[in-house]
């Protein structure tokens, strides 16, 4: 029983640390003079199936973390913290979008594999800047591959694509007044 308790405490501290790191990065991406509103978003089953088919990527968890970023009560962006499966372990990444649904920054928050960590390289991630729901996320065409990191490259690219799809959905729902 004690072991289970310690595992839960340890897992909770890891999640809190990842969320704290994500929020620090969000503040660096959007500036210090912004308001950040956190939402643990649980897509309904129909939405989840749609997102998985559209992005060709299954969700690892039932929820994702979403932040609405506002300045003077005006929405300026949405950030999404999500996980994709690398070769065998999750890759936790953050995608920051402007209010038009275009990516302004991406960041690998936690990379757990021994190989393929190059997907966390800022220069590689910068090629996604400006991508949105209508962008072509094809590896080798608009996105450079990384030798030795094929699985991670595909996973992160599909993850950012799914984030763009989610942001488009959230922006549309926000205009309608709800998620």
Segments and roles (model prediction):
Residues 17-143, 150, 154, 158-179:
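Flexible, solvent-exposed loop/hinge segments and secondary-structure transition points
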Residues 3-13:
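Sec-dependent N-terminal signal peptides
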């Amino acid at each position: 029983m004690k072991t289970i308790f310690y595992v839960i405490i340890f897992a909770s501290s890891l999640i809190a640390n990842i969320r704290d790191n994500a929020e620090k990065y969000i503040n660096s991406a959007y500036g210090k003079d912004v308001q950040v509103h956190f939402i643990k978003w649980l897509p309904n089953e129909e939405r989840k199936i749609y997102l998985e088919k559209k992005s060709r990527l299954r969700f690892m968890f039932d929820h994702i973390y979403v932040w609405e970023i506002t300045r003077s009560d005006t929405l300026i962006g949405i950030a999404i913290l999500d996980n994709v499966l690398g070769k065998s372990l999750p890759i936790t990444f953050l995608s920051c979008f402007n209010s038009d649904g275009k990516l302004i920054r991406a960041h690998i928050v936690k990379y757990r594999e021994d190989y393929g960590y190059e997907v966390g390289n800022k220069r590689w991630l910068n090629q996604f800047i400006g991508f949105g729901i209508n962008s072509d996320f094809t590896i080798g065409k608009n996105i450079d591959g990384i030798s030795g990191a094929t699985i991670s490259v595909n996973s992160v690219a599909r993850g950012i694509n799914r984030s763009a799809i989610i942001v488009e959905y959230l922006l549309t729902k926000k205009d309608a007044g709800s998620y």
